[in-house]
Curated annotation (Swiss-Prot):
GO terms for cellular component: cytosol. Pfam families: CTP_transf_3. This is 8-amino-3,8-dideoxy-manno-octulosonate cytidylyltransferase. The gene is kdsB. Its main location: cytoplasm.
Length: 245
C-alpha cells in the first residue's frame, strides 16, 4: 500500500497570520510538524501542500518536499485534492492529512491510523484519531472538538459542544478529535464532490459532511495528545512541551 502524508499549510490565517512560519524553539512550526511526521514508519512520501512561496522556501530550506496548490482552495481537503492530483496518486493510494499546526504530533499516532487501513482493507473509506480528555477545561471549550463513536469504533458525531452530555461526566470518558485524517485518493474526490452539509455548516466541522452523506469514519484512540496551535499564546505552551519531549 502506497502511503503519502500531506501537510496543508496556508499563510493567511485570520487569527494568526503566518502561523506555519512561527518560530518554536528556533525552528518554524511547519518544520516541527514535518520532522515529527518523518519519524513515522510506513510512509512512502511527505509533502507540504501550500500556495505560499514563503512557506515553500522555508520547507525547502530544511530539505522538505513541497507541492504548490491553487490559491482558491476553499478548505484543507480541497488543497489536499489539488496536491494529490498533481502528484498523480492512484485511486487506492492512502493519503494522510496532517494539519500544519500540530507541532506536537507523535509519530506513533500516524502509524496507528495507517495500521487501521492495513488491518481492515476495504471496510471503510476514512479514518481519524481521538484522545481521551483529561483536562476538564477542554470539555466546554469549542476549540476542542469532542467526538462519540459506536462499539465498533465508527464515529457517530463530532461537536464543539461537550458530547456526550451528562450531569456528572467525572467518571465517564470524553474524547476529543485530533486533526489527522486518512483516506484513499478515490474518497478524497468523492468527499469534495458532496455538497456542503447542514451540520458541517452549523458546527464548522468538515468531517461532518462525510457522516451526513452516509460515509463511515473509523476511529483509533491515541495515547498521545496533539494540541493545535491556534494563537500566538499556544506557541509558548508548545515550546514548554517540546523541551520536556
Amino acid at each position: 500500500m502506497n502511503v503519502t502524508l500531506l501537510i496543508p499549510a496556508r499563510y493567511g490565517s485570520s487569527r494568526f497570520p503566518g502561523k506555519p512560519l512561527a518560530p518554536i524553539n528556533g525552528k518554524p512550526m511547519i518544520q516541527h510538524v514535518y520532522e515529527r511526521a518523518a519519524l513515522a514508519k510506513g510512509l512512502n512520501a511527505i509533502y507540504v501542500a501550500t500556495d505560499d512561496e514563503r512557506i515553500k522556501d522555508a520547507v525547502e530550506s530544511f530539505g522538505g518536499k513541497v507541492v504548490m496548490t491553487g490559491a482558491d482552495a476553499a478548505s484543507g481537503t480541497d488543497r489536499i485534492e489539488d496536491a494529490i492530483t498533481q502528484l498523480g496518486l492512484a485511486d487506492d493510494d492512502l493519503v494522510i492529512n496532517l494539519q500544519g499546526d500540530q507541532p506536537l504530533i507523535d509519530p506513533i499516532s500516524i502509524e496507528q491510523i495507517v495500521e487501521l487501513f492495513r488491518r481492515h482493507p476495504g471496510e471503510f473509506e476514512m479514518a481519524t484519531l481521538g484522545y481521551q480528555i483529561s483536562d476538564k477545561a477542554e470539555l466546554d471549550d469549542p476549540k476542542h472538538v469532542k467526538m462519540v463513536f459506536d462499539n465498533d469504533m465508527y464515529a457517530l458525531y463530532f461537536s464543539r459542544a461537550c458530547i456526550p452530555f451528562g450531569r456528572d461526566v467525572s467518571e465517564y470518558p470524553v474524547y476529543k478529535h485530533l486533526g489527522v485524517y486518512a483516506y484513499t485518493r478515490r474518497f478524497v474526490h468523492t468527499f469534495n464532490s458532496l455538497p456542503l452539509g447542514r451540520l458541517e455548516d452549523l458546527e464548522k466541522l468538515e468531517q461532518l459532511r462525510a457522516l451526513e452523506y452516509g460515509h463511515r469514519i473509523k476511529v483509533a484512540i491515541s495515547a498521545f495528545d496533539s494540541p493545535e496551535v491556534d494563537t500566538p499564546e499556544d506557541i509558548r505552551r508548545c515550546e514548554n512541551r517540546l523541551k520536556v519531549d
